[in-house]
Amino acid sequence: MNPQGHIVFIVDDDARIRESLCDLLASLGSSAVAFGSVGEYLSYARPDLPACLILDIELPDINGLDFQKQISDQDHPPIVFITGHGDIPSSVRAIKHGAIDFLTKPFSEADLLAAIRAAVALDGKARQERAELATVRQRFSSLTPRERDVFPLVVSGLLNKQAAAELGISEVTLQIHRRNVMQKMEAASLADLVRIAEKLQIPITRSRRTGAP
């Protein structure tokens, strides 16, 4: 099963379901770890790999939908729900809160595997984005206070003389700071620096835009 280098977590209180899913995934070359409760899953040291969480609705310690809500702002893998008692309100709630799919038992292998592939791909992309954000944040932390003042002015589109006037420094000094910002942020162009600023959510006020009153 592609992509490689991923792991599937299974949380279901039915031992037979856990065993059958682990066997299926193992036969396809996927790593899988199964748990009988959410508590067991949370106590597991998850490896740093793209992942998918196959989650039952009715669990001994918490309802799967409630658990989904609890972890909505945390870095847990995308969820594929499986349940023997599915209903439309539950499926709508699950999908609305980001579940990849909501499968009612018995479900087809094809549907499950398609959902797992989608979840792993989504998690891989999210991990890459988090890594890129961590990198640009580290670069931003290397800027001096003055360079941090210059950064939003540069990406706002102000001319050097306009930015220099706003900061009360010479145009030559502004150009030096601008060059340092470009180098430290490893921006190949102004457009590249703008994209970095967007990732960092660098604020740009109306007064900083070219032609603003």
Regions found by a protein language model. Give the residues of each.
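Acidic, metal-coordinating helix/loop segments flanking the phosphotransfer/catalytic sites
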Residues: 34-52
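Active-site residues of response regulator receiver
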Residues: 56, 83
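Recognition helix of helix-turn-helix DNA-binding domains
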Residues: 159-192
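Acidic catalytic/metal-coordinating carboxylates
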Residues: 36-37, 63-66
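Short amphipathic alpha-helix used as the core "switch/output" element in two-component signaling
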Residues: 43, 65-77, 93, 97
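Basic, Lys/Arg-enriched C-terminal extension of HTH/homeodomain DNA-binding domains
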Residues: 182-213
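C-terminal output helix
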Residues: 87-89, 103, 107-117, 162, ...
